[in-house]
Amino acid sequence: WAHYNDCAVFTNNPSGNAINPCTLPAAPSSPQADHIWARIDPFLTAGQPRSVILDGRPGTGKSTMARNLAARMGGRVLLVSLDGAENVFKVSGLEVLNFLRPDAVILDDFDRLGGHAVNCLDGLEKCRSRLLIVTTNNLHSMDPAIVRPGRFDELFTIDSLGAAYFRDVLGSGCWEALSAENQAKVEAWPAAF
């Protein structure tokens, strides 16, 4: 275990992944985060676990959105970075999940697992987390067994926020002070912010 950004991170484990159990701070609201939360919260409140795929091109804020949703739920969150992973949850990952019993699990860059993704999900079914969130840059490149109906409860595409959100956050005076070019740049910022 090592400390990183005030969290304990399980590193140098046989799976080769950074497994980070932590409690996330409250997240700012955004229209898309509010929409997704409105879809999953009634189930979580009723005690029914939910599984969510967040899909979108790189840089749209899927990872931030995943943290936002997990923070809204509260409780213990397990962040797993799958960047370049091949052996996630074969042995040590499942042991960590069973030991920590997180309320939410976030699997970042899930599409990087390739053919190992189905095995990973099968292992996660044994973990009784209330919320499973996976992020992917290319849903269509994933094994059809992953995206078949019934495997995940919800699929959301993450995109940019748009001008209305930033007018609310920045205030109309500040927004109007931006040049048209800068307004266009800000409008393209990820939806998770």
Feature map (PLM): residue ranges:
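Short glycine-rich substrate-engagement loop in P-loop NTPases that contacts/grips substrate
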Residues: 37, 73-101, 114
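Conserved catalytic/switch belt of AAA+ P-loop NTPases
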Residues: 109-149, 154
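Hydrophobic anchor at the beta1->P-loop junction of P-loop NTPases
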Residues: 54
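Conserved catalytic network of the ASCE P-loop NTPase/AAA+ motor domain
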Residues: 44-47, 71-73, 95-101, 121-129, ...
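AAA+ P-loop ATPase mechanoenzymes
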Residues: 1-49, 57-58, 65, 69, ...
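Conserved AAA+ ATPase small/helical "lid" subdomain
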Residues: 160-167, 173-193
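Conserved nucleotide-binding/hydrolysis micro-motifs of P-loop NTPases
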Residues: 84-86, 111-112, 138-141, 160-166, ...
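Walker B beta-strand of ABC/ABC-like P-loop ATPase nucleotide-binding domains
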Residues: 105-106
